[in-house]
Swiss-Prot record:
Complex and partners: Part of the 50S ribosomal subunit.
UniProt keyword Lipid metabolism, yes or no: no
Keywords of this entry: Chloroplast, Plastid, Ribonucleoprotein, Ribosomal protein
Major location category of this protein: plastid
Example GO molecular function: structural constituent of ribosome
Family: Belongs to the universal ribosomal protein uL16 family.
GO BP of this protein: mitochondrial translation
Protein name: Large ribosomal subunit protein uL16c
Pfam family, one: Ribosomal_L16
PROSITE patterns in UniProt: RIBOSOMAL_L16_1 (PS00586), RIBOSOMAL_L16_2 (PS00701)
Chloroplast among keywords: yes
């Protein structure tokens, strides 16, 4: 699963997800992509589940790019712990995803295969997504 090798600080504020994605919202590497339509945190486990689903479906050929990285630590306190005594310890990592953000890109497979693979990955995501195609200028 994805996680940063090291960070400047162990813990982060939760933050807010206002507006739409201004970066990472267009296809850069592949021909087909899965785009987020809602704001959410996507965990490293969910990213990995989507990656596995796509690679299993499009087994021969095809290149996959993961366009999001979980760089935000989410803290949790132990169960049945009294209030106070500081913030909990980091438990898992999430990627902050805004509407319009590209999650996965794929190329080297037919559109029908890419569409089916992305649909399987979309079921693993906690948000609504859409399948998009790169505009090829000839």
């Amino acid at each position: 699963m994805l996680s940063p090798k090291r960070t400047k600080f162990r813990k982060q504020h939760r933050g807010r997800m206002k507006g739409i994605a201004t970066r990472g919202n267009s296809i850069a590497f592949g021909k087909f992509a899965l785009q987020a339509l809602e704001p959410s945190w996507i965990t490293s486990r969910q990213i990995e589940a989507g990656r596995r689903a796509i690679t299993r479906y499009a087994r021969r050929g095809g290149k996959l790019w993961i366009r999001i990285f979980p760089d935000k630590p989410i803290t949790m306190r132990p169960a049945e712990t009294r209030m106070g005594s500081g913030k909990g310890s980091p438990e898992y990592w999430v990627s902050v995803v805004k509407p319009g953000r590209i999650l996965y890109e794929i190329s080297g497979v037919p559109e029908s295969v890419a569409r089916a693979a992305m649909r399987i990955a979309a079921y693993k995501m906690p948000i609504r997504t859409q399948f998009i195609t790169a505009i090829t200028s000839v």
